[in-house]
Design a protein with these regions (language model features):
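Conserved ATP-driven motor cores of ASCE-family P-loop NTPases powering translocation/secretion/packaging/pilus
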Residues: 282-284, 288-370
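Short, surface-exposed polybasic-aromatic patches that bind anionic ligands, especially phosphate groups
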Residues: 380
């Protein structure tokens, strides 16, 4: 199947038209083209309500991860790790454990020293391996949380030895620190995991997985993920699922070169989610029949979430840049510079910051295939073909 795969980044303040003009329209188009999708929806559930019937009528395999109402499918990020371990896929197992541990650990705010984040990540890797190597019946975020408490109360509880080689290698390095330092590392890891498991309903829907994530690359699938965007406690859950899904899709490409069914990620509030090595994934996405549409509020938001160098790489990997209404100075400056200059003497931008400030609702500055323009977008509910 030939398809025009391009990555897109969309900027704009809340209510400027990012969802109605881009996210929902691209979802509708992808469904009509037979592409698989991931879409995250906010508390308004606008994307889900606007596209579910179309997805159903097109015969899609529909997966619903509902962290708003706690209905639909369940997802345990460690189920695939366990499968890899039991299948003796040590390389894939190790890679996914590393990705999950990194996705869980956001850098400690206010600290420029990476020691705590690195140490906490190492500890989480170690206790995941410990659960695997001791053949624990329960392997989940909840089990990790319990193990953090038990091992911090009495390190000898773990009983590390020859039967736990990977866990011993990782955890002994943590436990050789001073008692105070070790306690702080364990506290950081526990706080990281427990910040996700904030109620009994989340614990319940993260104990098992109700679908086979490895079948997603082979079936026409749409994944709806609903979550309350106003609460950062759910950012970790979204990050974990996206991290694992991207891992699965890319390793499916390792066998075939590219996906037979193109896959489209439409990720709203992208800057809130910590996706390890994302800049590497997006730089090679198009050749694998994978595309990303990333919706953010401003350049500042992206740089805070991913650092300036990574944010620049992500922007450079997006062939389409669309900027709706915003008052963010850095975003206005960046977009004005992207528009190019009218002459080589005065360096007058083709689109000034003042022009960008005058954008109306649903109107956006666009850089499509390196060509700047200002376009008026049509929201999904004004489409003639909208059901």
């Amino acid at each position: 199947m030939k398809t025009d795969i391009k990555n897109t980044i969309v900027l704009g303040e809340p209510g400027s038209g990012k969802t109605s003009c881009i996210a929902i329209n691209e979802t509708i188009d992808a469904l009509k083209q037979g592409h698989s999708l991931f879409v995250n929806d906010n508390s308004k559930e606008e994307i889900y309500k606007s596209t579910y019937d179309l997805a159903k009528s097109q015969g899609y395999n529909i997966i619903l991860l509902d962290y708003l109402n706690y209905k639909g499918d369940s997802f345990n990020c460690l189920d695939l790790v366990k499968d890899y371990y039991q299948e003796n896929e040590s390389v894939l197992c190790g890679e996914l454990i590393s990705l999950i541990s990194e996705a869980l650990n956001k850098p400690v705010k206010g600290s420029e020293d990476p020691f705590w984040t690195i140490s906490s990540t190492t500890y989480i890797k170690g206790i995941i391996y410990y659960l695997l190597e001791t053949k624990s019946k329960k392997i989940s975020l909840e089990a990790l949380s319990h193990l953090c408490v038990e091992s911090s109360a009495r390190i000898e509880f773990l009983g590390l030895g020859r039967s736990t080689p990977m866990a011993s290698s990782l955890l002994n390095g943590v436990f050789t620190n001073s008692e105070k330092t070790t306690a702080s590392i364990l506290m950081t890891a526990f706080a990281t995991i427990s910040s996700i498991l904030t109620n009994s309903k989340i614990k319940r829907i993260t104990r098992t997985t109700s679908f086979d994530i490895r079948k997603i690359p082979k079936e026409k699938t749409i994944i709806y993920l609903k979550y309350p965007e106003y609460s950062e406690q759910y950012d970790g859950l979204v990050s974990l699922f996206l991290t694992e899904l991207i891992h699965v899709l890319y390793h499916s490409c390792d066998q075939t070169g590219q996906l037979d069914i193109p896959f489209h990620f439409i990720i709203d509030e992208f800057a809130h989610f910590r996706l390890p090595s994302f800049e590497r994934y997006i730089s090679t996405a198009r050749s694998r029949n994978i595309q990303f549409t990333l919706l953010i509020q401003s350049m500042d938001q992206l740089e805070i979430g991913y650092s300036k160098p990574v944010a620049k790489t992500i922007m450079d990997c997006c062939q389409n840049i669309i900027s709706f209404q915003t008052t963010n100075y850095n975003t206005l400056t960046y977009m004005s510079q992207l528009s190019g200059y009218r002459d080589t003497v005065g360096h007058l931008p083709r689109v000034s910051m003042n022009d960008l400030l005058k954008l109306r609702p649903f109107e956006a500055f666009c850089l499509i295939n390196h060509q700047p323009s200002i376009q008026l977008f049509k929201p999904y509910f004004m489409r003639r073909d909208y059901l």
